[in-house]
């Protein structure tokens, strides 16, 4: 029998192999970029994506007030911008200005997306619910855009305090 070591449940959750990293944008006038690893596809039909945000974060209130948001998948070349947006509060700094990332107007929502990201999803907020120490904001994807020749190997993931890219493909389904 394989020997297993018991661990604290929170530490156990952090052993999940990887979480995608996204830059979420919320708001038109008072906008902010937040780095998130709690992101999940909740449904394919209709297409629903959710992000989990702690109530103590500045973006939490902005997400509550806004009818929409964008989810943006950054490539590995944006790792410094991703870290900056995760370490600074939007209360204190305009993250678009400080990072040099470019807001692009939404096609179907008021909130901008990030031009430099590999993939942009425009989402209309359809549901909000609290789970433990996070609030989940669920959005229906109303527009999706990707760079031509999108290579998912460039997308950032987060695991055990490290930003990574995808690894070896073992086998197709």
Question: Which residue ranges define each predicted feature?
Answer:
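Basic, polyanion-binding surface patches
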Residues: 1-173
């Amino acid at each position: 029998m394989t020997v297993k070591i018991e661990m604290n449940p929170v530490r156990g959750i952090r052993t999940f192999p990887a979480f995608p990293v996204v830059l979420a944008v919320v708001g038109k006038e008072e906008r902010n970029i937040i780095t998130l690893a709690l992101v999940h596809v909740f449904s394919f039909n209709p297409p629903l994506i959710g992000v989990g945000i702690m109530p103590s974060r500045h973006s939490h209130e902005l997400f509550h007030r806004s009818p929409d948001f964008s989810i943006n998948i950054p490539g590995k070349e944006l790792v410094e911008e991703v870290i900056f947006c995760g370490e600074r509060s939007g209360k204190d700094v305009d993250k678009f200005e400080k990072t040099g990332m470019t807001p692009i107007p939404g096609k179907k929502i008021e909130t901008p997306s990030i031009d430099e990201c590999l993939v942009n999803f425009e989402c209309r907020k359809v549901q909000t619910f609290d789970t433990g120490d996070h609030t989940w904001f669920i959005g229906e994807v109303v527009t999706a855009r990707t760079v031509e020749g999108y290579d998912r190997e460039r997308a950032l993931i987060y695991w055990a305090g490290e930003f990574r890219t995808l690894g070896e493909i073992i086998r197709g389904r």
